[in-house]
Amino acid sequence: MTETSGRDTTAKGRPGSIWLRGTKKRAVKQPLSREQIVRAAVQLLDEGGVRNLRMRQLAESLNSAPMSLYWHVPTKDDLLELAVDEVFPDPPARSTPGDWSQDVKAGAEGLFDVLLEHAWMIELMGSHPPVGPRALAHTGAVIRILEEAGFVPPQLDSALSAIYYYTVGAALTEVSWQTMAQHSGENEEDWAQRLGPYVELTAAQDDAQSLSAYVKRSATSSTGQRFHDGLECMVHGMERMRSLPS
């Protein structure tokens, strides 16, 4: 299997995404399946992140030789793309008709929880657009919810973008704060409390007090609550936008 660090490593004229390529025909029964390989990769990614994922280590975890993985997953980039789709959440289920906002929030919260649980996804989604079957099913379900709620283009497209941009961006922010706190050897609240005085000294005088107060408030609120409150603000804005003429 070829390990690559860049994204565009395929032969000229060959689709860059593994989802856009055909599947090799299996001439003989293989001892491994692609599903087994991907699940094992997800476990290693959860333990050590993208930078520490090694194909040799993956093969050892499966009691196989590294080259035996090549038949199923040609490159490490392909494996990472498959891993992102493997852990993508189930599509949001539609609840009581007319309650579209609850369904939208359920879809966003499900994705947010998965991104926090598998923080490596956030890094990969910057170079591996989620276009696998599970990701498309999730997006398709959200589109149907919005359509049935009466959203039409261009408002529908704007609402869809807002949902995913906010969710991924919020998860990125939370993970970065948690990572910094872990690296400092402190919990998130203690680290944020120490950050307050630095903000007061560094920020523009007119902004320092407000920024410092915000940092301290953020340290005492839960990750889920911060996300939920922001999501509520966004959904209320979407409700107003829904009534605008297309």
Curated annotation (Swiss-Prot):
Signal sequence interval, chain numbering: none
Any Gene Ontology biological process: negative regulation of DNA-templated transcription
Keyword hit for DNA-binding: yes
Annotated Pfam families: TetR_C_1 (PF02909), TetR_N (PF00440)
Disruption phenotype: Deletion of the gene results in increased lincomycin A (Lin-A) production, but delayed mycelium formation and sporulation on solid media.
Residues covered by the HTH tetR-type domain: 31-91
Keyword DNA-binding: yes
Keywords: Activator, DNA-binding, Repressor, Transcription, Transcription regulation
Domain of life: Bacteria
Induction trigger: Negatively autoregulated.
Regulation: Activity is regulated by the effector molecule D-arabinose, which binds to AbrT and reduces its binding affinity to the abrT-SLCG_1980 intergenic region.
DNA-binding region per UniProt: 54-73
Purpose of the protein: Transcriptional regulator that plays a pivotal role in regulating lincomycin production and morphological development in S.lincolnensis. Exhibits opposing regulatory effects, directly or indirectly repressing the expression of lincomycin biosynthetic (lin) cluster genes and directly activating the expression of the morphological developmental genes amfC, whiB and ftsZ. Binds to two motifs present in the bidirectional promoter between abrT and SLCG_1980, which encodes an arabinose efflux permease, leading to the repression of the genes.
Protein name as catalogued: HTH-type transcriptional regulator AbrT
Species of origin: Streptomyces lincolnensis
Taxonomic lineage of the native organism: Bacteria, Bacillati, Actinomycetota, Actinomycetes, Kitasatosporales
Name of the encoding gene: abrT
